[in-house]
A protein has these predicted regions:
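Short hydrophobic/aromatic-rich motifs at helix boundaries and adjacent loops
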Residues: 26-29, 56-60, 140-141, 180-181
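Non-catalytic positions within long, well-ordered alpha-helices that form the structural scaffold/packing
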Residues: 25, 59, 86-90
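Secondary-structure boundary/capping positions in well-ordered alpha/beta enzyme cores
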Residues: 31-32, 65, 179
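Active-site cores that bind ATP or allylic diphosphates and position pyrophosphate for catalysis
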Residues: 68-399
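Short, contiguous strand/loop micro-motifs
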Residues: 7-8, 41-42, 58, 72-73, ...
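N-terminal catalytic cores of NTP/NDP-binding nucleotidyl/phosphoryl-transfer enzymes
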Residues: 1-54
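A glycine-rich helix N-cap at a beta->alpha junction
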Residues: 55-70
């Protein structure tokens, strides 16, 4: 592996992320490119910190190039998220993908990916769903258990990072067959797990967001690289972090405004089985964002999926308006001596989103959606900013 790729959110960047970057170099990579969620993250929310802070954090701790994973691609289910990230990094020229997994066995993950791509699996999954499976995740695991010759294949699908890892492997098989998979064991706390002394200096991003909400930047200091902590202190002092209470109210306001139209959510991506009606009814009766999610969430419709649906609806992300894969490479920052690696990119590449917006119809549609997400996010910070900030944002070059 010469040019490693990592798909990340860095929400926020912490010691586990720095360890992963170091491991990519230890595996032999000369350079590491990151496809980083821009303006939105996969759970259907705004990131805690701005792109500039997260980009500089990654570059300070070992990344060589950081590209924006466009907001519509970042705010997506595991399959679409993985496909977008792999496609972006393949277009950048990466020959290896480094990612975390509870089961860091590349051969086993690829075996699971091959199974999930098979026609027999799709038929078994359809039968499980038709048979009244409690959830998609349960149906997925049951279908895999029914067909897998190795019981470990179905068992690994019971873990969240393994599920995303398998989707990365499926995307590699489909979009970048020459790319190698390099799974790494997850360090410290799992997603959503409470902090414990046994985890040492490692904490999950969700735990760090909770710590930040309770005690500000100082509270996360033990779990982030020393070189990154001053960036967090500056962001906190300047109010450049998300006010999630304000974000929820702003999102609900956008959804209420949309309800003035007839069938307001019929064309929103991800809508099926009458979800557009369920969403409209929930919007009309909810007075808080949490009430909205409570009204939408069921065993069949997990909260994360409903958060993504609500965000898509608030920002007007329709099914037929957005490319499924990134049509360009938006460079957020890089090391100056890594810039020659950009010469082999197979998509338009620039640090200027305005320039990329003019590179074709698909690029224009993706860039407009990205700007909508960015403008929503900057309004929802503790110290809000004016529209168009992403167009004015200076590239970050480190020596």
């Amino acid at each position: 592996m010469k040019f490693a790729g990592i798909i990340a959110e860095y929400d926020p960047f912490h010691n586990g992320h720095a360890w992963q970057l170091a491991q990519a170099k230890a595996l032999g990579a000369e350079r590491v490119a990151v496809a980083m969620s821009c303006s939105l993250v996969q759970r259907g929310a705004l990131p805690l910190l701005p792109e500039a802070v997260r980009t500089r954090s990654a570059l300070t701790c070992g990344a060589d190039l950081v590209f924006a994973l466009p907001a519509p691609c970042a705010c997506a289910g595991a399959e679409a998220f993985a496909r977008a990230g792999v496609a972006l990094l393949a277009a950048a020229g990466c020959d290896g993908l480094v990612f975390g997994a509870e089961t860091p066995d590349a051969a086993l993950l690829m075996e699971a990916a091959e199974l999930l791509d098979s026609g027999s699996y799709r038929a078994a999954l359809k039968a499980q769903l038709a048979g009244g499976a409690r959830s998609f995740a349960a149906a997925r695991q049951a279908a895999a258990a029914q067909l897998a010759s190795d019981e470990r294949v179905a068992a690994l699908l019971d873990k969240p990072n393994n599920n995303l890892a398998v989707e990365y492997c499926r995307a590699i098989r489909s979009l970048a067959p020459r790319m190698e998979a390099y799974p790494l064991p997850r360090q410290g706390a799992n997603h959503g797990e409470a902090l414990h002394s046994a985890h040492g200096q490692f904490a999950s991003a969700s735990a760090l967001r909770k710590l930040w909400a309770e005690g500000g930047a100082d509270a996360v200091a033990p779990y982030v690289p020393e070189a990154v902590f001053p960036l967090y202190q500056e962001a906190y002092a300047a109010g450049q972090y998300t006010d999630f209470s304000a974000a929820g109210r702003c999102e609900l306001a956008l959804l209420r405004s949309a309800c003035r139209d007839k069938a307001p959510f019929a064309d929103i991506r991800g809508v099926s089985e009458g979800l557009e009606h369920r969403l409209e009814a929930a919007v009309r009766t909810s007075t808080t964002y949490d009430e909205l999610l409570d009204a939408l969430t069921t065993v069949r419709y997990p909260r994360a999926r409903m958060r993504r649906l609500a965000m898509d609806a608030a920002l007007g992300f329709t099914a037929d308006s957005l490319p499924a894969l990134p049509p360009y490479l938006h460079l957020l920052g890089g090391k100056k001596d890594a810039l020659p690696f950009l010469k082999n990119c197979t998509l338009p590449v620039s640090h200027s989103l305005a320039r990329l917006r003019g590179s074709g119809d698909a690029s224009a549609r993706m860039a407009e959606a990205q700007l909508a997400a960015s403008d929503f996010g900057t309004l929802c910070r503790v110290s809000p900013e004016a529209m168009g900030g992403l167009l004015r944002q200076k590239n970050i070059f480190l020596t």
